[in-house]
Amino acid sequence: MPPPSPDSENGFYPGLPSSMNPAFFPSFSPVSPHGCTGLSVPTSGGGGGGFGGPFSATAVPPPPPPAMNIPQQQPPPPAAPQQPQSRRSPVSPQLQQQHQAAAAAFLQQRNSYNHHQPLLKQSPWSNHQSSGWGTGSMSWGAMHGRDHRRTGNMGIPGTMNQISPLKKPFSGNVIAPPKFTRSTPSLTPKSWIEDNVFRTDNNSNTLLPLQVRSSLQLPAWGSDSLQDSWCTAAGTSRIDQDRSRMYDSLNMHSLENSLIDIMRAEHDPLKGRLSYPHPGTDNLLMLNGRSSLFPIDDGLLDDGHSDQVGVLNSPTCYSAHQNGERIERFSRKVFVGGLPPDIDEDEITASFRRFGPLVVDWPHKAESKSYFPPKGYAFLLFQEESSVQALIDACIEEDGKLYLCVSSPTIKDKPVQIRPWNLSDSDFVMDGSQPLDPRKTIFVGGVPRPLRAVELAMIMDRLYGGVCYAGIDTDPELKYPKGAGRVAFSNQQSYIAAISARFVQLQHGDIDKRVEVKPYVLDDQMCDECQGARCGGKFAPFFCANVTCLQYYCEFCWANIHSRAGREFHKPLVKEGADRPRQIHFRWN
């Protein structure tokens, strides 16, 4: 039979030369067509082609090494049919040891060849690293930054670039897919990775410890089950059929084909939307970069703590259901700004009635008795929270803001701003390790309604530091911001610095407002002086906000303590019904 062309297998990955190409390994001799399976290596110069001596009694003359653009001088004589070289087995223990030694030397020569060959293009594969995979649970940073092809990825030895700094490298010369330790039900069946795949002794194959599928294909997008495309007509998995077949070190066909298929997926239009189904798991489907293998990630994306813009940009904003009950995500009160000046209440109601029953309101509507919103904005009070989500779906987003076209008698299709309130923006915990101390909490009055709790926390932490919690006060019925907030500090120094300033400039985006800062007053605190002994066990009505006091007092103790020199000008604070501390003037008897 004619010899294979030197360029027949050179179309593979440029950083990993083909093992079946004789141009790369001129020291190899073809296998004898007879029963002996040894390798014949020339011994000229004492080196023996890098192996150190002969390996077989059959001395077959090696073919001359082919060169670029130089045809072979003459075809080899016809030989009898022979078995494939990659699957021949030694007939004696001595020949078996010789075969293993030849394979080890071949690997060493191939690796040294790879290190001296320049790469023709950028490679997305990982570097050959020295540290190994950890056996513990994966860190959050690694899960968060995982690659969408991680289930089908494998390390390749050689000088190749690392695909992600968050991935842990492989150890030694063992090349294996990443091994995830998960307790999810989908991983309960027997793993497709055998127990001895990480062996590195002389009796194990260190090139590739498991048989890789030679044809890695992406299932159709509209298929009902990804697992169906991996099963044969008999109902058995192709991976299961090849599970016991270890990879032959002298046969690189399957590895080449697999890597070619994976590299072709680099330019696949479904990149980032659909991952390769991993054998041994139950249909690991990843849509929009989210996989069922990582339920922690999906939970964090849907727990309501994501950015508001991201929630508004989602295709469907409908509430989730938990235990048969719908979970509300938005307040039923929605701000509408930029209304036409001649639009009245009925026209506003007609413009938004298609989303659900609602009532139109604006500040001081009852007192002013006006039929038009005086300042060009109003509030929509929907009966159902699902109406708010339907309104959000109908809006147009631009620069992180939502708009909807509204018409008046003189203006047609005027874009008005729709500003819903996400309930998750009412609270933000910056440092969960610190307990919330009401004695280290401040009240912030006049907070702009678009300001979220996370933004309030960032501003206060930048000014005073030590912020562990921030909250926006909302009304109990509609859960809409009331224009006030609370900030809890983890230390007394930050708390005193904040209340000593009295006023803070809130700057964020379009917001630039000077607000007042006071101590957060509680209405269920006992007197710090008498502990209720002098007031019949009643709660203390007064709180002294001066930094020299910062205590709750009953009426008797207040008069007693603040009659001293230097404290007669202290002014007590009391809590109003709307969670707002009010300053009063204490009258001396």
Swiss-Prot record:
Protein's UniProt keywords contain RNA-binding: yes
Keywords noted in UniProt: Cytoplasm, Phosphoprotein, Repeat, RNA-binding, Translation regulation
Stretches with biased composition (Pro residues): 60-81
Superkingdom as given in the UniProt entry: Eukaryota
A cellular-component GO term for this protein: synapse
Residue span(s) of domain RRM: 332-423, 440-522
Record text on subunit structure and interactions: Interacts with TENT2/GLD2.
Functional description taken from the UniProt entry: May play a role in translational regulation of stored mRNAs in transcriptionally inactive haploid spermatids. Binds to poly(U) RNA oligomers. Required for cell cycle progression, specifically for the transition from metaphase to anaphase.
Protein name: Cytoplasmic polyadenylation element-binding protein 2
